[in-house]
Curated annotation (Swiss-Prot):
This is Phenylacetone monooxygenase. Optimum pH is 8.0. The lineage of its organism: Bacteria, Bacillati, Actinomycetota, Actinomycetes, Streptosporangiales. Binds 1 FAD per subunit. Monomer. It comes from Thermobifida fusca (strain YX). Transmembrane segments: none annotated. Its cofactor is FAD. Catalyzes a Baeyer-Villiger oxidation reaction, i.e. the insertion of an oxygen atom into a carbon-carbon bond adjacent to a carbonyl, which converts ketones to esters. Is most efficient with phenylacetone as substrate, leading to the formation of benzyl acetate. Can also oxidize other aromatic ketones (benzylacetone, alpha-methylphenylacetone and 4-hydroxyacetophenone), some aliphatic ketones (dodecan-2-one and bicyclohept-2-en-6-one) and sulfides (e.g. methyl 4-tolylsulfide). It catalyses: phenylacetone + NADPH + O2 + H(+) = benzyl acetate + NADP(+) + H2O. GO terms for molecular function: flavin adenine dinucleotide binding; N,N-dimethylaniline monooxygenase activity; NADP binding; phenylacetone monooxygenase activity. Belongs to the FAD-binding monooxygenase family.
Length: 542
């Protein structure tokens, strides 16, 4: 199941740098670019064989972004904004990876990256206020600052079904897909998981496979993407005001041009509700989540919108029994990540597609021949695991990160992640996270969050060097206040009611803690700016 790499040579990392960055996805590349611009010595360590991060590994058929391409891109370079032309409303994985490569080539970023290399440990030296970082190749690098740009969805979560290693057929995980095309023609294929990757990959497999079995435990809410080619005239007009357009997105709750409807879903008639939601449905995309101001705050308001979507599913899938099993129930709409689908529900009208409800007939074991549930065995040629990721903390915990007093980050966060502003954590000086727990992160346009975080962290590092300071550490009391604030705001919404990867519920044994800041990107950005303006209030600088 290992993914193949694409760059053959391995660059020897330097022994000492001002800043070491872990990860060469969108976050790490921008950190590298910006620190170079600020005149600091910087190097990036990356496990993969090339740039791309999540878009390097997730090459499964149908993979695409759920943020519109014109907003899911860097805004720091006017040249890049003008030179690159997106072709679709929602860019596919190959196009996003081409874009990342375009940026890496344009700014010669690969010259500052060591590929094929995994950071295994990082320890803070209190005597020198530096980090000592070890890799799986025996490299040891000393850095004043350590930036974790290791991604929110970079550690695939494998199911703990007995017998998984005994399966004799082809086994794939959507989060670590082969680089060469996979042909499912004539095969009996099983897909386990119906989150974002499962809903994206299944319709593509259904076009090839002789038979497709979709193993579903929890139905998800999915709405039409209405993906389409972008009009060249539209792009030309947009580029005349692209910088202004992107700045507007930085002043919104989600970091995109999605605006909250002013009305309550409880104050409108059935006719008005259906008319409004139908308009969003036909337009496609996730904006239906913002159709009314109380969708994510009031259970009754949420239920009215949820039932509209359930009826859409019932009206799409011809078999009423299958349709009802696909209808999400038992949790509020939008509290799991809203999925954009292309032909997913229509797929179940195909004769070669079968839904297996594992709530009523749980998977008991993986056999050499396929999947056995409590009812029967399904013989398969290929099995696709669309079982998600150990989100937000998974990549951090794969590294033995030790701070003051040799305390491990994994130990400090044993009951759940604790950060100040999502940027740093007390007891771990000179360590910064990009789009980590306690920040808007995955609840926002990731590119907007990434740029804001990278700019804040690199500005802070520049401030430290300018003022002859060598140690920046979050104050524990401020961290506690921030965690309390994050939880208070989350508790004003319906999010914590639902078991999701936002709360770590998809990983056995992981603490159930809501890990994201739901107060809005614009509000979060303002808080971070105020902290910086006050001489980095909440940090002890020495």
């Amino acid at each position: 199941m290992a993914g193949q790499t694409t760059v053959d040579s391995r660059r020897q990392p330097p022994e000492e740098v001002d800043v070491l960055v872990v990860g060469a996805g969108f976050s790490g590349l921008y950190a590298l670019y910006r620190l170079r611009e600020l005149g600091r010595s910087v190097h990036v360590i990356e496990t993969a064989g090339d740039v791309g991060g999540v878009w390097y590994w997730n090459r499964y058929p149908g993979a695409r972004c759920d943020i519109e391409s014109i907003e899911y891109c860097y805004s720091f370079s006017e040249e890049v904004l003008q030179e690159w032309n997106w072709t679709e409303r929602y860019a596919s994985q190959p196009e996003i990876l081409r874009y990342i490569n375009f940026v890496a080539d344009k700014f010669d970023l690969r010259s500052g990256i060591t590929f094929h290399t995994t950071v295994t440990a990082a320890a803070f030296d209190e005597a020198t206020n530096t980090w000592t970082v070890d890799t799986n190749h025996g490299d040891r690098i000393r850095a004043r600052y350590l930036i974790m740009a290791s991604g929110q969805l970079s550690v695939p979560q494998l199911p703990n079904f007995p017998g998984l290693k005994d399966f004799a057929g082809n086994l794939y995980h959507t989060g670590n897909w082969p680089h060469e095309p996979v042909d499912f023609s004539g095969q009996r294929v099983g897909v386990i998981g119906t989150g974002s990757s499962g809903i994206q990959v299944s319709p593509q497999i259904a076009k090839q496979a002789a038979e497709l079995f979709v193993f579903q435990r929890t139905p998800h809410f999915a709405v039409p993407a209405r993906n389409a080619p972008l009009d060249p005239e539209f792009l030309a007009d947009l580029k005349k005001r692209y910088a202004e357009f992107r700045e507007e997105s930085r002043n919104t709750p989600g970091g995109t041009h999605r605006y909250q409807g002013p009305k309550s879903a409880l104050e409108v008639s059935d006719e008005e509700l259906v008319e409004t939601l139908e308009r969003y449905w036909q337009e496609g995309g996730p904006d239906i989540l913002a159709a009314y101001r109380d969708i994510l705050r009031d259970r009754d308001a949420n239920e009215r919108v949820a039932e509209f979507i359930r009826n859409k599913i019932r009206n799409t899938v011809r078999d009423p029994e299958v349709a009802e099993r696909l209808v999400p129930k038992g949790y509020p709409f939008g509290t799991k990540r809203l999925i954009l689908e292309i032909d997913y529900y229509e797929m179940f009208n195909r004769d070669n597609v079968h839904l297996v409800d594992t709530l009523s007939a749980p998977i008991e074991t993986i056999t050499p021949r396929g999947v056995r549930t409590s009812e029967r065995e399904y013989e398969l040629d290929s099995l696709v695991l669309a079982t998600g990721f150990d989100a937000l903390t998974g990549a951090l915990f794969k590294i033995d990160i030790r701070g003051v007093g040799n305390v491990a980050l994994k130990e400090k966060w044993a009951a759940g992640p604790r950060t100040y502003l999502g940027l740093s954590t007390a007891g771990f000086p000179n360590l910064f996270f990009i789009a980590g727990p306690g920040s808007p992160s995955a609840l926002s346009n990731m590119l907007v969050s990434i740029e804001q975080h990278v700019e804040w962290v690199t500005d802070h590092i520049a401030y430290m060097f300018k003022n002859g300071l060598t140690r920046s550490e979050a104050v524990l009391e401020k961290e506690d206040e921030w965690v309390e604030h994050v939880n208070e705001i989350a508790d004003e919404t319906l999010y914590p009611m639902t078991a999701s990867w936002y709360t770590g519920a998809n990983v056995p044994g992981k603490p159930r803690v809501f890990m994201l800041y739901v107060g809005g990107f614009h509000r979060y950005r303002q808080i971070c700016d105020e902290v910086a303006a006050k001489g980095y209030e909440g940090f002890v600088l020495t």
